[in-house]
Amino acid sequence: MIVVLFLLLPPVPEATWEWPTEGAHRVVRDFRAPTSPWGPGHRGLDLAAEGPHLLAPTHGTVSFSGEVAGKGVLTLRTPEGLLISFEPVEALVEQGEQVAKGQIIGRVLPGHCPQACIHIGLREKGLYRSPRRELGVLQRSVLLPLEDYALG
C-alpha cells in the first residue's frame, strides 16, 4: 500500500529559473518565514557563489538598482509580477532595463556570509516566500515509520 502511495506522488518540480551564481548549486542558509510582518526571519536564500558573476535567473525588468542600508541591491520584476531581489551586489544593469535569462546582471560582493554568497529574496503579491521551487532545490517529502517518534 505504501509503495502504491509513493508511486502516486507528483514528481519534484524541475527548476523554472537558472541558478544565479557560478559553481556548485548550494544553499548556504535557508528561508525562514517571520512569525509576524515585521518579525525576525530570513526572507530568502543565501546561495554559494564560486565566481564573481550574478546571472539573471529568468527574464524580466530591473525595477531597482541601488543601495539599501549600505548594501548594493538589485531587484528584477518578472512578467508574472514576481520581485526577485539580490544582495550584496554591484549592479551591471540599470533600472528599467530588460534582462534575459542567464545574462550577467551584476558582481557578487563580500559582506553577507563568511564565504562568498548572494542573498536572493522572492516576493509574490507583497509577501516573501522561498524561491526553492523556481530554483529546483525542493526536496521530496519522506514518510517515516510512526514508531520512530514519540507522540505528544
PLM features: what roles do these ranges have?
Residues 48, 77-79, 123:
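A generic structural motif
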Residues 51-54, 89-97:
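Short, surface-exposed secondary-structure edge patches
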Residues 119-127:
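A short hydrophobic beta-strand segment most commonly corresponding to one strand
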Residues 2-73, 100-101, 129-133, 137-152:
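Surface-exposed, glycine-biased beta-strand/turn segments
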Residues 57-92, 116-119:
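Zn2+-dependent peptidoglycan hydrolase active-site motif and core
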